[in-house]
From Swiss-Prot:
The keyword Cell inner membrane does not apply. Expressed at low levels in germinating seeds, seedlings, rosettes leaves, flowers and siliques. InterPro entries: Chaperonin_GroES, Chaperonin_GroES_sf, GroES-like_sf. Belongs to the GroES chaperonin family. This is 10 kDa chaperonin 1, chloroplastic. Functions as a co-chaperone for protein folding in chloroplasts. One of its GO terms (molecular function) is ATP binding. The lineage of its organism: Eukaryota, Viridiplantae, Streptophyta, Embryophyta, Tracheophyta. It comes from Arabidopsis thaliana (Mouse-ear cress). The keyword Oxidoreductase does not apply. Keywords: Chaperone, Chloroplast, Plastid, Transit peptide.
């Protein structure tokens, strides 16, 4: 899990400065100093099964295809990515979804899907509308 460091400035603070100038009497002048503090923001991992889509949205776990074909030919990344985005397993559904249930395998268009990163290393997920699903695979 990677952490990010950002610096956020505090408001200006006044503090006394002593001077040793011979022409000025020993007095305290106000100086202005700018402080800052550091915030350590750590990204959290989400359990995909606990994420509930809203309305007619569906959460789909993208199917990962092997990088080699059955004949041993290495497939280019663009071909693997294109095919992978067309199939997946439904993880959870919104309250207005009618026919689709969790556990079903679906085909969908990658143009209407919104990919999200839950911090899990094993799979990628995306949200799409129920109307954007092309088919349910039996």
């Amino acid at each position: 899990m990677a952490s990010s460091f950002i610096t956020v400035p505090k408001p200006f603070l006044s503090f006394p400065i002593k001077t040793n100038a011979p022409t000025l009497p020993q007095q305290t002048l106000l100086g202005i100093r700018r402080n800052s503090f550091r915030i350590n923001a750590v990204s959290t991992k989400w359990e995909p099964a606990k994420v509930v889509p809203q309305a007619d949205r569906v959460l789909v776990r993208l199917e990962v295809l092997p990088e080699k074909s059955s004949g041993g030919v290495l497939l280019p990344k663009s071909a693997v990515k294109f095919e992978r985005y067309l199939t997946g397993e439904v993880v959870s559904v919104g309250s207005e979804v009618g026919e689709v249930e969790p556990g079903k395998k679906v085909l969908f268009s990658d143009m209407s899907a919104y990919e999200v990163d839950f911090g899990t290393e094993d799979a990628k997920h995306c949200f799409c509308k129920e109307s954007d699903l092309l088919a349910i695979v039996q």
